[in-house]
Amino acid sequence: MALPNQQTVDYPSFKLVIVGDGGTGKTTFVKRHLTGEFEKKYEPTIGVEVHPLDFFTNCGKIRFYCWDTAGQEKFGGLRDGYYIHGQCAIIMFDVTARLTYKNVPTWHRDLCRVCENIPIVLCGNKVDVKNRQVKAKQVTFHRKKNLQYYEISAKSNYNFEKPFLYLARKLAGDANLHFVESPALAPPEVQIDLAAQQLHEQELLQAAAHALPDDDDEAFE
């Protein structure tokens, strides 16, 4: 699908919209992919930057046209033009800022109002930061809405490929699809405590085994 400012390529390409509160790290995340950063285009009518992110799979190359809001969400909601023709999405929140997680349902609602039945990944960013405010076990929204959830650290490249691989598998209808080489990523700006992160991953697994709370906000009181 050729969208504004997107060159047509002869391999599968998809419009990926990335939403979430301002300051959650959406732009930092997209900019890690160096060729996408180099080839980005600005779409002035909607006020977004479109980054073409290529990935190499066992079934050939695929491209995600990542639409980045350029900070517009700080001034209110996004226009429908941002969402229209979206084929997949990432909702991002900051694990060091509780409000950004509390606002996830609003972003999800806005997204689903325009884009029905598209694959969506929820990402908790900044897991490299020590003073985490949203604990792994408190993240339950994805279970209620049947979304995939990943903990990421954009600045350290931790789990960078996972959201894209999940979306690629869903869009291709192939659970065995895999990446055969890594994209060129910017060097890590921070190092992540892998032992601490493995502990969070364990908490996620344990949380998944428990019944869902009635109210998402209970854990924050």
From Swiss-Prot:
Protein transport found in the keyword field: yes
Entries under Pfam families matching the protein: Ras
SUPFAM superfamilies for the chain: P-loop containing nucleoside triphosphate hydrolases
Gene3D superfamilies: P-loop containing nucleotide triphosphate hydrolases
Domain Small GTPase Ran-type: residue ranges: 10-174
Record key words, sorted: GTP-binding, Nucleotide-binding, Nucleus, Protein transport, Transport
Compartmental location: Nucleus
One CC-aspect GO term: cytoplasm
Region (Switch-II): 71-87
One MF term in the entry's GO annotations: GTP binding
GO terms classed as biological process: protein import into nucleus; ribosomal subunit export from nucleus
UniProt-annotated stretches for the region Switch-I: 40-48
Domain of life of the source: Eukaryota
Positions with a binding annotation for GTP: 21-28, 71, 125-128, 153-155
Record SMART domains: RAB, RAN, RAS, RHO
Function: GTP-binding protein involved in nucleocytoplasmic transport. Required for the import of protein into the nucleus and also for RNA export. Involved in chromatin condensation and control of cell cycle.
UniProt family annotation: Belongs to the small GTPase superfamily. Ran family.
Subunit structure comment from the entry: Found in a nuclear export complex with RanGTP, exportin and pre-miRNA.
Name of this chain's protein: GTP-binding nuclear protein Ran-B1
Lineage of producing organism: Eukaryota, Viridiplantae, Streptophyta, Embryophyta, Tracheophyta
